[in-house]
Protein backbone atom coordinates (compact mmCIF):
# COMPACT_ATOMS: atom_id res chain seq x y z
CA UNK A 1 0.00 0.00 0.00
CA UNK A 2 1.39 3.37 -0.98
CA UNK A 3 1.87 5.69 1.99
CA UNK A 4 0.71 9.29 2.16
CA UNK A 5 4.34 10.37 1.73
CA UNK A 6 4.87 8.20 -1.36
CA UNK A 7 1.68 9.40 -2.97
CA UNK A 8 2.54 13.01 -2.25
CA UNK A 9 6.06 12.74 -3.68
CA UNK A 10 4.78 11.08 -6.85
CA UNK A 11 2.18 13.80 -7.33
CA UNK A 12 4.71 16.54 -6.72
CA UNK A 13 7.02 15.08 -9.36
CA UNK A 14 4.14 14.96 -11.82
CA UNK A 15 3.40 18.62 -11.12
CA UNK A 16 -0.32 17.95 -10.77
CA UNK A 17 -0.97 19.56 -7.40
CA UNK A 18 -3.04 22.58 -8.27
CA UNK A 19 -3.98 23.91 -4.84
CA UNK A 20 -2.58 23.54 -1.34
CA UNK A 21 -4.84 24.10 1.67
CA UNK A 22 -2.77 24.97 4.75
CA UNK A 23 -4.00 24.33 8.29
CA UNK A 24 -2.13 25.33 11.43
CA UNK A 25 -2.33 24.87 15.20
CA UNK A 26 -5.79 23.33 15.49
CA UNK A 27 -4.92 21.72 18.86
CA UNK A 28 -7.37 18.78 18.92
CA UNK A 29 -10.21 20.91 17.49
CA UNK A 30 -11.82 18.75 14.82
CA UNK A 31 -14.77 21.12 14.47
CA UNK A 32 -12.49 23.85 13.14
CA UNK A 33 -10.73 21.39 10.80
CA UNK A 34 -13.93 19.90 9.39
CA UNK A 35 -15.41 23.36 8.96
CA UNK A 36 -12.48 24.62 6.87
CA UNK A 37 -12.44 21.46 4.73
CA UNK A 38 -16.17 21.92 4.14
CA UNK A 39 -15.84 25.65 3.38
CA UNK A 40 -13.20 24.84 0.75
CA UNK A 41 -15.45 22.20 -0.80
CA UNK A 42 -13.00 19.35 -0.20
CA UNK A 43 -15.03 17.40 2.35
CA UNK A 44 -18.58 17.05 3.61
CA UNK A 45 -19.59 18.28 7.04
CA UNK A 46 -18.26 15.10 8.67
CA UNK A 47 -14.83 15.48 7.13
CA UNK A 48 -15.15 12.82 4.44
CA UNK A 49 -13.62 13.57 1.05
CA UNK A 50 -16.21 14.65 -1.53
CA UNK A 51 -16.42 12.76 -4.79
CA UNK A 52 -14.77 14.48 -7.70
CA UNK A 53 -12.20 16.45 -5.70
CA UNK A 54 -8.91 16.43 -7.60
CA UNK A 55 -5.40 17.87 -7.38
CA UNK A 56 -5.40 19.16 -3.82
CA UNK A 57 -2.76 18.87 -1.15
CA UNK A 58 -3.75 19.52 2.46
CA UNK A 59 -0.78 20.55 4.60
CA UNK A 60 -1.05 20.85 8.37
CA UNK A 61 1.96 22.74 9.73
CA UNK A 62 1.78 21.05 13.13
CA UNK A 63 0.06 21.11 16.51
CA UNK A 64 -2.85 19.04 15.25
CA UNK A 65 -2.86 17.51 18.75
CA UNK A 66 -2.65 19.04 22.20
CA UNK A 67 0.49 17.97 24.04
CA UNK A 68 -1.15 17.76 27.47
CA UNK A 69 -4.36 16.03 26.43
CA UNK A 70 -3.99 14.48 22.95
CA UNK A 71 -7.34 13.19 21.75
CA UNK A 72 -7.13 9.76 20.07
CA UNK A 73 -10.12 10.68 17.90
CA UNK A 74 -8.26 13.75 16.58
CA UNK A 75 -5.32 11.61 15.53
CA UNK A 76 -7.66 9.01 14.01
CA UNK A 77 -9.37 11.73 11.97
CA UNK A 78 -6.12 12.92 10.38
CA UNK A 79 -4.98 9.34 9.88
CA UNK A 80 -8.18 8.57 7.96
CA UNK A 81 -8.06 11.87 6.05
CA UNK A 82 -4.54 11.00 4.92
CA UNK A 83 -5.18 7.36 4.02
CA UNK A 84 -8.49 8.03 2.25
CA UNK A 85 -7.30 10.95 0.12
CA UNK A 86 -8.36 10.65 -3.55
CA UNK A 87 -5.71 9.44 -5.99
CA UNK A 88 -4.78 12.95 -7.12
CA UNK A 89 -4.83 14.40 -3.60
CA UNK A 90 -2.62 14.07 -0.53
CA UNK A 91 -2.44 15.06 3.12
CA UNK A 92 0.87 16.18 4.63
CA UNK A 93 1.02 16.27 8.43
CA UNK A 94 4.03 18.07 9.86
CA UNK A 95 4.93 17.71 13.52
CA UNK A 96 4.71 20.80 15.70
CA UNK A 97 6.09 21.40 19.15
CA UNK A 98 2.96 19.79 20.64
CA UNK A 99 3.59 16.50 18.82
CA UNK A 100 7.32 16.63 19.59
CA UNK A 101 6.81 17.45 23.28
CA UNK A 102 4.21 14.69 23.48
CA UNK A 103 6.80 12.21 22.19
CA UNK A 104 9.32 13.62 24.66
CA UNK A 105 6.89 13.04 27.53
CA UNK A 106 6.24 9.47 26.43
CA UNK A 107 10.00 8.82 26.10
CA UNK A 108 10.45 10.02 29.69
CA UNK A 109 7.86 7.53 30.95
CA UNK A 110 4.74 9.71 31.14
CA UNK A 111 1.62 7.84 30.04
CA UNK A 112 -0.77 9.15 27.40
CA UNK A 113 -4.20 8.28 26.01
CA UNK A 114 -2.64 7.39 22.66
CA UNK A 115 -1.86 3.79 21.74
CA UNK A 116 1.55 2.58 20.58
CA UNK A 117 0.25 2.42 17.01
CA UNK A 118 -0.93 6.02 17.23
CA UNK A 119 2.41 7.17 18.61
CA UNK A 120 4.08 5.30 15.76
CA UNK A 121 1.85 7.21 13.32
CA UNK A 122 3.14 10.51 14.72
CA UNK A 123 6.72 9.34 14.22
CA UNK A 124 6.01 8.68 10.54
CA UNK A 125 5.16 12.32 9.83
CA UNK A 126 7.60 14.81 8.39
CA UNK A 127 9.31 17.80 9.99
CA UNK A 128 8.99 20.04 6.93
CA UNK A 129 7.59 20.07 3.42
CA UNK A 130 9.00 21.79 0.34
CA UNK A 131 6.85 22.30 -2.73
CA UNK A 132 8.09 24.37 -5.64
CA UNK A 133 9.44 27.58 -4.08
CA UNK A 134 7.60 27.28 -0.75
CA UNK A 135 8.83 25.88 2.56
CA UNK A 136 6.12 24.66 4.93
CA UNK A 137 7.30 24.43 8.53
CA UNK A 138 5.77 24.52 12.00
CA UNK A 139 7.74 27.53 13.18
CA UNK A 140 10.54 29.72 11.88
CA UNK A 141 13.47 28.54 9.70
CA UNK A 142 16.82 28.40 11.48
CA UNK A 143 20.34 28.50 10.12
CA UNK A 144 21.08 24.93 11.24
CA UNK A 145 18.02 23.51 9.47
CA UNK A 146 18.65 25.41 6.24
CA UNK A 147 22.35 24.51 6.21
CA UNK A 148 21.37 20.83 6.41
CA UNK A 149 18.86 21.31 3.60
CA UNK A 150 21.47 22.99 1.42
CA UNK A 151 23.98 20.22 2.07
CA UNK A 152 21.49 17.56 0.98
CA UNK A 153 20.60 19.56 -2.12
CA UNK A 154 24.26 19.95 -3.07
CA UNK A 155 24.95 16.24 -2.54
CA UNK A 156 21.86 14.85 -4.26
CA UNK A 157 20.58 17.66 -6.46
CA UNK A 158 17.11 17.52 -4.94
CA UNK A 159 15.39 17.95 -1.60
CA UNK A 160 12.94 15.02 -1.85
CA UNK A 161 15.38 12.72 -0.03
CA UNK A 162 15.77 15.17 2.84
CA UNK A 163 12.42 14.49 4.50
CA UNK A 164 13.22 10.78 4.78
CA UNK A 165 16.72 11.43 6.10
CA UNK A 166 15.59 13.96 8.66
CA UNK A 167 12.64 11.82 9.75
CA UNK A 168 15.03 8.96 10.46
CA UNK A 169 17.45 11.12 12.47
CA UNK A 170 14.61 12.91 14.21
CA UNK A 171 12.79 9.85 15.56
CA UNK A 172 15.14 6.87 15.60
CA UNK A 173 17.99 5.80 17.86
CA UNK A 174 19.16 6.48 21.38
CA UNK A 175 20.08 10.07 20.52
CA UNK A 176 17.06 10.88 18.36
CA UNK A 177 16.71 14.63 17.79
CA UNK A 178 13.15 14.82 19.06
CA UNK A 179 14.36 14.05 22.60
CA UNK A 180 16.53 17.17 22.78
CA UNK A 181 15.95 20.91 22.75
CA UNK A 182 17.62 20.94 19.33
CA UNK A 183 14.68 18.93 18.03
CA UNK A 184 12.30 21.76 18.85
CA UNK A 185 14.64 24.27 17.22
CA UNK A 186 14.71 22.05 14.13
CA UNK A 187 10.96 22.55 13.65
CA UNK A 188 11.34 26.30 14.18
CA UNK A 189 10.36 26.60 17.84
CA UNK A 190 12.43 29.73 18.51
CA UNK A 191 11.67 31.46 21.79
CA UNK A 192 12.60 35.02 20.78
CA UNK A 193 12.15 35.19 17.04
CA UNK A 194 13.13 38.79 16.25
CA UNK A 195 16.13 38.61 18.57
CA UNK A 196 17.26 35.41 16.84
CA UNK A 197 17.17 36.95 13.37
CA UNK A 198 18.80 40.19 14.53
CA UNK A 199 21.66 38.35 16.23
CA UNK A 200 25.06 38.79 14.61
CA UNK A 201 27.30 35.87 13.69
CA UNK A 202 31.07 35.66 14.11
CA UNK A 203 31.49 37.27 10.69
CA UNK A 204 29.12 40.10 11.62
CA UNK A 205 26.35 38.94 9.31
CA UNK A 206 22.91 39.02 10.92
CA UNK A 207 21.20 35.64 11.28
CA UNK A 208 18.17 36.92 9.38
CA UNK A 209 20.31 37.93 6.40
CA UNK A 210 22.02 34.55 6.40
CA UNK A 211 18.67 32.74 6.64
CA UNK A 212 17.47 34.78 3.65
CA UNK A 213 20.59 33.90 1.66
CA UNK A 214 20.29 30.18 2.47
CA UNK A 215 16.63 30.12 1.48
CA UNK A 216 17.40 31.83 -1.82
CA UNK A 217 20.20 29.34 -2.49
CA UNK A 218 17.62 26.60 -1.97
CA UNK A 219 15.28 28.27 -4.45
CA UNK A 220 12.78 29.13 -1.70
CA UNK A 221 11.22 32.59 -1.58
CA UNK A 222 8.19 31.88 0.64
CA UNK A 223 7.82 30.30 4.09
CA UNK A 224 4.39 29.36 5.45
CA UNK A 225 4.26 28.44 9.12
CA UNK A 226 2.08 28.40 12.22
CA UNK A 227 3.13 28.20 15.87
CA UNK A 228 2.64 31.79 17.01
CA UNK A 229 -0.58 33.74 16.46
CA UNK A 230 -0.64 37.40 15.49
CA UNK A 231 -3.73 38.98 17.04
CA UNK A 232 -5.83 35.98 15.97
CA UNK A 233 -5.36 36.71 12.26
CA UNK A 234 -2.98 35.40 9.62
CA UNK A 235 -0.04 37.70 9.01
CA UNK A 236 1.47 38.11 5.55
CA UNK A 237 4.99 39.45 4.94
CA UNK A 238 5.98 38.80 8.55
CA UNK A 239 9.55 39.72 9.54
CA UNK A 240 10.26 41.35 6.18
CA UNK A 241 12.84 43.66 7.79
CA UNK A 242 14.58 40.90 9.73
CA UNK A 243 14.64 38.33 6.87
CA UNK A 244 14.87 40.50 3.73
CA UNK A 245 13.72 39.19 0.38
CA UNK A 246 11.68 36.31 1.82
CA UNK A 247 7.91 36.25 2.13
CA UNK A 248 7.03 34.76 5.52
CA UNK A 249 3.36 33.97 6.20
CA UNK A 250 2.13 33.24 9.72
CA UNK A 251 -0.94 31.03 9.30
CA UNK A 252 -1.74 30.60 13.01
CA UNK A 253 -4.94 32.48 13.87
CA UNK A 254 -5.83 30.14 16.76
CA UNK A 255 -8.54 28.38 14.76
CA UNK A 256 -9.66 26.52 17.89
CA UNK A 257 -10.74 29.91 19.29
CA UNK A 258 -11.84 31.76 16.16
CA UNK A 259 -13.69 28.81 14.60
CA UNK A 260 -11.79 28.65 11.31
CA UNK A 261 -8.50 29.57 9.73
CA UNK A 262 -6.50 28.42 6.72
CA UNK A 263 -4.49 29.59 3.74
CA UNK A 264 -4.96 28.42 0.16
CA UNK A 265 -1.98 28.46 -2.20
CA UNK A 266 -2.51 28.07 -5.94
CA UNK A 267 -0.07 26.74 -8.54
CA UNK A 268 1.27 30.26 -9.15
CA UNK A 269 2.05 30.81 -5.47
CA UNK A 270 -0.86 33.21 -4.94
CA UNK A 271 -2.16 32.98 -1.35
CA UNK A 272 -5.75 33.47 -0.21
CA UNK A 273 -6.83 33.44 3.43
CA UNK A 274 -9.81 31.82 5.10
CA UNK A 275 -10.77 33.44 8.39
CA UNK A 276 -13.83 34.91 10.17
CA UNK A 277 -13.07 38.47 9.05
CA UNK A 278 -12.93 37.54 5.36
CA UNK A 279 -16.16 35.57 5.78
CA UNK A 280 -17.88 38.55 7.39
CA UNK A 281 -16.73 41.02 4.73
CA UNK A 282 -17.82 38.73 1.89
CA UNK A 283 -21.36 38.32 3.19
CA UNK A 284 -21.37 35.47 5.69
CA UNK A 285 -20.91 31.72 5.55
CA UNK A 286 -23.06 30.84 2.53
CA UNK A 287 -21.72 33.61 0.30
CA UNK A 288 -18.16 33.02 1.45
CA UNK A 289 -18.25 29.28 0.76
CA UNK A 290 -19.75 29.89 -2.67
CA UNK A 291 -16.93 32.30 -3.55
CA UNK A 292 -14.17 30.05 -2.19
CA UNK A 293 -15.53 27.00 -4.03
CA UNK A 294 -15.80 29.08 -7.19
CA UNK A 295 -12.12 30.02 -6.96
CA UNK A 296 -11.01 26.46 -6.18
CA UNK A 297 -13.27 24.72 -8.67
CA UNK A 298 -14.92 22.64 -5.95
CA UNK A 299 -18.41 24.06 -6.42
CA UNK A 300 -21.30 22.58 -8.38
CA UNK A 301 -19.77 23.46 -11.75
CA UNK A 302 -16.38 21.96 -10.78
CA UNK A 303 -14.68 24.74 -12.70
CA UNK A 304 -12.34 27.34 -11.24
CA UNK A 305 -13.24 30.95 -11.99
CA UNK A 306 -11.95 34.39 -11.13
CA UNK A 307 -13.62 36.60 -8.55
CA UNK A 308 -14.07 40.37 -8.87
CA UNK A 309 -11.00 42.31 -7.80
CA UNK A 310 -12.61 43.65 -4.63
CA UNK A 311 -13.41 40.11 -3.49
CA UNK A 312 -9.89 38.91 -4.20
CA UNK A 313 -8.56 41.82 -2.16
CA UNK A 314 -10.49 40.57 0.87
CA UNK A 315 -9.04 37.08 0.49
CA UNK A 316 -5.54 38.33 -0.26
CA UNK A 317 -2.85 39.93 1.82
CA UNK A 318 -4.35 43.44 1.76
CA UNK A 319 -7.08 42.47 4.21
CA UNK A 320 -4.65 40.84 6.59
CA UNK A 321 -2.49 43.93 7.04
CA UNK A 322 -5.50 45.88 8.25
CA UNK A 323 -6.19 43.52 11.16
Would you name each region that the model predicts?
Residues 36-112:
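Core catalytic region of metal-dependent phosphoesterases/phosphodiesterases
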Amino acid sequence: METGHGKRDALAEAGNLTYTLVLSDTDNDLNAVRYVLWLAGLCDRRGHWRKGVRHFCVVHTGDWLNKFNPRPEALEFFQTLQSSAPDSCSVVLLVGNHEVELLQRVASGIRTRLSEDQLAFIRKQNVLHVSRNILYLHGYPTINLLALLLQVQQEHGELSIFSHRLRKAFYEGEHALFKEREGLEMIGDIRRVKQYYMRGGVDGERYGVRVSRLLQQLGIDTVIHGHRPHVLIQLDHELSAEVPGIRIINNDNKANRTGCGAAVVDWKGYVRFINPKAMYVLGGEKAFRKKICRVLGTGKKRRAAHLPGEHEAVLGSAAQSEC
